[in-house]
Amino acid sequence: MDADPVELRVLGCLLEKQRTTPDQYPLSLNALRLACNQTTNREPIVSYDEGEIHEALQRLARRGWSRLASGAGSRAAKYRQLFDEALGLGGDEVAILCVLMLRGPQTPGELNQRTGRLHAFSGIDAIHATLDGLAARGLVERLERRPGQKEERYRHLLGVDQQESDAQHSPTSTRSDELGSSAAPAGLEARVAALEGEVARLREALSTLARADAGPT
């Protein structure tokens, strides 16, 4: 799947608010903007405007993941998500994907703590079971445990988000970073060597001129 960062943030907010503030759901464009840009329970913090959010809603609608849902007499357009219906997801699966969309890669322990308002998991074993089910469907993947980490982390596979940790945890990206970091010093050394050679040539030219000036008149 190839949802972009704005789509993922908008979708995550629709899923979250449907469950945490059902009396205010569906959401208006302004309510979605506030939800997307709030500074709690969001990683990274963003500042999307209504135009960006509206365009993301249109892309989500084309995927069949959201739709306009204004009721009779409503003065503002409101939107709801169709993601769970489109993918046939249960409440436990939605809760985990929602947190991964809004907060980036998480450990099972973090998911157990942060899904409390979205779904009543019976414990960490239930989190693991749900993650296994999502992984089997190609919706999440387990990331390599980094040195010093006690738990593995999981990320969603719905698209590309803005979490730098995604690239840092990805084995492919990590390898690319290592190659880039090793290539940088080598390139720098080559430039320094070239500059040193140029300086040596300039010194030789100046020395030649000095000898010529000091010759017999």
Map each language-model feature to its residues.
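Hydrophobic residues on short alpha-helical segments
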Residues: 7, 11-14, 33, 93-100
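N-terminal positioning helix adjacent to the helix-turn-helix/winged-helix DNA-binding module
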Residues: 6, 28, 89-92, 191
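Short, amphipathic alpha-helical interaction segments positioned at domain boundaries
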Residues: 72-110, 152, 156-187
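Intrinsically disordered, low-complexity serine/threonine- and proline-rich regulatory segments
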Residues: 1-19, 23, 57-88
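Helical coiled-coil/dimerization "stalks"
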Residues: 114, 146-158, 204-217
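Short acidic, hydrophobic short linear motifs in intrinsically disordered regions
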Residues: 21-45, 105-121
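Amphipathic alpha-helical oligomerization/assembly segments
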Residues: 178-213
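A short, conserved structural fragment
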Residues: 54-57, 61-71, 131-146
